[in-house]
Swiss-Prot record:
Class of enzymatic activity (EC top level): ligase
Phosphoserine: residues bearing it: 568, 571, 574
Record PANTHER family: CTP SYNTHASE, CTP SYNTHASE 2
Name of protein: CTP synthase 2
Catalytic activity as recorded in UniProt: UTP + L-glutamine + ATP + H2O = CTP + L-glutamate + ADP + phosphate + 2 H(+)
Glutamine amidotransferase type-1 domain residues: 300-554
Short name of one Pfam family: GATase
UniProt similarity note: Belongs to the CTP synthase family.
One cellular component (GO) term of this entry: mitochondrion
Recorded metabolic or biological pathway in which this protein acts: Pyrimidine metabolism; CTP biosynthesis via de novo pathway; CTP from UDP: step 2/2
One BP term from GO: pyrimidine nucleobase biosynthetic process
Record organism: Homo sapiens (Human)
Length: 586
């Protein structure tokens, strides 16, 4: 097993996750089996109870793990399925050690950070690195580990010490440290400054880790003189200084790394049985990055949500839309609309914001209402859903978005004016959306219906069924505590709103579709968590196809989005023969 530790310096949020994912992608393109681990040095057990404004979206794994959004990057880049134990937190480690102490496993010893916490970290990493993640039963060969935060943070000290010890346990030829640092550029002079990187590397060395590669993040390409200066003062060869500047798309990052001979370096440094360059997989990434930059036609989608001030709150939704837009050769223009801005109260308090929000909604080719919690902003979401339904605008509702679509239809089409969710009105006269009793204990953490679940199609005449490849059932990831009341669905199906997908027992409503509408679909699950750059999510793909006027032609062509499909490379903008560009990982 080979271990690649990715650390960061100067500031957080400079792209360690993307760089770690890109490194894994390059090594996978060389024919190696790759897994990934993210370490978050916070005391929370997992990310399940975080506000989206704290760390961005909560990403959900197949096994129901609620984890950091970086694991979503790993899954998308590497096309793998990780587990909740691939996300290590300080809380998990301390809980694990304290439980062992309570059982008496330490035989009365004084339990300390060193060696007990550090040993637990090393043991966890070694055990989890062996777990297959690509659908095969073969053990991974490479484990990419990202240490969250920045070097010098007090929260991360036990983990840094753990890896200081681990580098000797694993042996030099099996352990490599990549340090990601910021090279700021002064706006007044345009000069790129190396001092922050020098200090960061010095701090890392002072803690016992020496970087094998220094990845320099900058707004513009780094000059050779700057690269040589970093090489000299940080005591590494020039080829060990990798420069990653801001690019138009993250698809370009693996290509930038590969162009700087990173494969050759890993081959020599870790004694890998590979060639000096990446294979056909990376060629597809290069082609995808090139195509992304050549796109001309634009598709505008309005995302109506309550967490729009921080884009990371909807990271997977954005990626799923981007994957689908790229697949049909369109550039995505995603317009974030705070749902409160669509409400009447905003018209009174801030008319300018109200009219700007409605102008965005009216200009959109398609409307998306994603998942969320709480009553704030729900009236605005209902307004957006009503607009999409009545004006025949393609619409996709996810989780809460689907529940609100059902409520909107009940109020405006079935005259059930008191229809509501018990999440918002516990004593609603018409409880259209109800809580699931088995998922309603006292604690909030990990108490929802989580992880991958099977959804069975009730009818063959379903748009989503066709988009999924005309299969009888699908498996997607869930994260919800409320569901549509199954006792009230008959009225809907008599009025063109069909519940075309249900769980295996037929008790839970999973998919809705509205007849006589270009695309009005709601799903209880979160398909964005399963979307991949080369295998876009069918519900999101359907939204983009409908928004560009190509859905009917695509369905008539009989295209299927199964793992065995081979799609032709369509770099032009024509869609005369509906098809998906060649995006699939082989």
């Amino acid at each position: 097993m080979k271990y690649i530790l990715v650390t960061g310096g100067v500031i957080s949020g400079i792209g360690k996750g993307i760089i770690a994912s890109s490194i894994g992608t390059i090594l996978k393109s060389c024919g190696l089996r790759v897994t990934a681990i993210k370490i978050d040095p916070y005391i929370n057990i997992d990310a399940g109870t975080f506000s989206p404004y704290e760390h961005g979206e909560v990403f959900v794994l197949n096994d129901g793990g609620e984890v950091d959004l970086d694991l979503g990057n790993y899954e998308r880049f590497l096309d793998i399925n990780l587990y909740k134990d691939n996300n290590i937190t300080t809380g998990k480690i301390y809980q694990h050690v304290i439980n062992k102490e309570r059982r008496g496993d330490y035989l009365g010893k004084t339990v300390q950070v060193v060696p007990h916490i550090t040993d637990a970290v090393q043991e966890w990493v070694m055990n989890q690195a062996k777990v297959p993640v690509d659908g095969n039963k073969e053990e991974p060969q490479i484990c990419v580990i990202e240490l969250g935060g920045t070097i010098g943070d007090i929260e991360g000290m036990p983990f840094v010490e753990a890896f200081r010890q681990f580098q000797f346990k694993a042996k030099r030829e099996n352990f490599c440290n990549i340090h990601v640092s910021l090279v700021p550029q002064l706006s007044a002079t345009g000069e790129q400054k190396t001092k922050p990187t020098q200090n960061s590397v010095r701090a890392l060395r002072g803690l016992g880790l020496s970087p094998d590669l220094i990845v320099c993040r900058s707004s513009t390409p780094i000059e050779m003189a700057v690269k040589e200066k970093i090489s000299m003062f940080c005591h590494v060869n020039p080829e060990q200084v990798i420069c990653i500047h801001d690019v138009s798309s993250t698809y370009r990052v693996p290509v930038l790394l590969e162009e700087q001979s990173i494969v050759k370096y890993f081959k020599e440094r870790l004694h890998l049985p590979i060639g000096d360059s990446a294979s056909n997989l990376l060629f597809k990434w290069r082609n995808m990055a090139d195509r992304y930059e050549r796109l001309q036609k634009i598709c505008s989608i309005a995302l109506v949500g309550k967490y729009t001030k921080l884009r990371d709150c909807y990271a997977s939704v954005f990626k799923a839309l981007e994957h689908s837009a790229l697949a049909i050769n369109h550039k995505l223009n995603l317009m974030y609309i705070d749902s409160i801005d669509l409400e009447k109260i905003t018209e009174t308090e801030d008319p300018v914001k109200f009219h700007e929000a409605w102008q965005k909604l009216c200009k959109a080719d398609g409307i998306l209402v994603p998942g969320g919690f709480g009553i704030r902003g729900t009236l605005g979401k209902l307004q957006a859903i009503s607009w999409a339904r009545t004006k025949k605008i393609p619409f996709l509702g996810v989780c809460l978005g689907m529940q609100l679509a059902v409520i909107e239809f009940a109020r405006n089409c079935l005259n059930l004016k008191d229809a509501d969710s018990t999440e918002f009105r516990p004593n609603a006269p018409v409880p259209l959306v109800i809580d699931m009793p088995e998922h309603n204990p006292g604690n909030l953490g990990g108490t929802m219906r989580l992880g991958i679940r099977r959804t069975v199609f009730k009818t063959e005449n379903s748009i989503l069924r066709k988009l999924y490849g005309d299969v009888p059932f699908i498996e997607e990831r869930h994260r919800h505590r409320f569901e549509v009341n199954p006792n009230l669905i008959k009225q809907f199906e008599q009025n063109d709103l069909s519940f075309v997908g249900q769980d295996v027992d037929g008790d839970r409503m999973e998919i809705i579709e509205l007849a006589n509408h270009p695309y009005f679909v709601g799903v209880q699950f979160h398909p964005e968590f399963s979307s991949r750059p080369m295998k876009p999510s069918p519900p999101y793909l359907g939204l983009l196809l409908a928004a560009t006027g190509n859905l009917n032609a695509y369905l008539q062509q009989g295209c299927k989005l199964s793992s065995s499909d081979r799609y032709s490379d369509a770099s032009d903008d024509s869609f005369s023969e509906p098809r998906i560009a060649e995006l699939e990982i082989s």
